[in-house]
A protein has these predicted regions:
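ATP-dependent adenylation/nucleotidyltransferase module used to activate substrates
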Residues: 1-148, 159, 169, 175
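AMP-forming adenylation/ATP pyrophosphatase catalytic core
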Residues: 115-247
């Protein structure tokens, strides 16, 4: 339902490809405590995507991958914070959903490519016979780092039409074609976490409370108090209320 995926579809249609639009249904807003509209799985976003698909004369489908998203993204996200690790759920979503489950659907439906609105580029090295994942031209929007897990087989069947464009060019194309989402804001936060408050999300999602406790060094000295283990990660220095020379 975003402007980037919409323009990616437009560019592929203009190249003469037969395209279909797809939205991955990953969760119900109420299941993850979201109340706002225009999340990636809201009805509004589905309707935006459907509108663009209609304008481009493409069939459009919604695939329900909620069970896999819960297991491979949300549950892993929660477990990471519970163990003091900083997760990146966007990497897991790409790895297990977009380029696994959606990739499987591409094969089943006899299409040749999964096309997304990611800002990244794919090149083929004739000398090594390998596909290369490269940064986008727009370095401010580059997303190649969240695509590191793509295999050679996946890279062979993936296209990123926006990799050679600036974001302003993408919006201009969307406006020129009167796309309903041409001025839609870019998503900044984790899609299933409201207002960026991951700790509140984890407590709501798990039904657990993570009580405050002591910061203790390796010698058993109490250095201060923390506000609950999920609010901190290994190596963190800022926001601890403790002045130390090293993490």
């Amino acid at each position: 339902g975003g402007v980037d995926s919409s323009v990616a579809a437009l560019l592929m249609k203009e190249k003469g490809y037969t395209c279909m639009g797809a939205t991955m249904k990953l969760y119900q807003n109420e299941d993850v405590g979201l109340r706002r509209e225009h999340t990636c799985c809201s009805l509004d976003d589905v309707e935006d995507a459907r509108s663009v698909a209609y304008a481009l004369d493409m069939p459009y489908y919604v695939f329900n991958f909620a069970d896999r998203f819960k297991t491979d993204v949300i549950d892993k996200f929660v477990h990471a914070y519970e163990t003091g690790v900083t997760p990146n759920p966007c990497i897991d979503c790409n790895r297990y959903l977009k380029f696994d489950k959606l990739f499987q659907r591409m094969v089943e439906l006899n299409y040749d490519y999964v096309v997304t609105g990611h800002y990244a580029q794919i090149d083929f090295d004739e000398n090594t016979g390998r596909y290369l994942l490269k940064k986008a031209v727009d370095h401010n929007k580059d997303q190649s780092y969240v695509l590191w897990s793509l295999t050679q087989e996946q890279l062979k069947h993936v296209q990123f039409p926006l990799g050679g464009m600036e974001k302003c060019e993408v919006r201009a194309l969307a406006e020129a074609h009167n796309f309903i989402n041409a001025r839609k804001h870019d998503s900044q936060d984790i899609c299933f976490v409201q207002n960026g408050s991951y700790a509140d999300f984890i407590e709501q999602y798990t039904g657990k409370t993570y009580p405050p406790g002591d910061f203790v060094d390796t010698d058993g000295n109490v250095l201060g108090q923390h506000r609950g283990v999920i609010r901190y990660t290994i190596g963190q220095r800022k926001g601890l209320g403790v002045a130390l020379p090293a993490p």
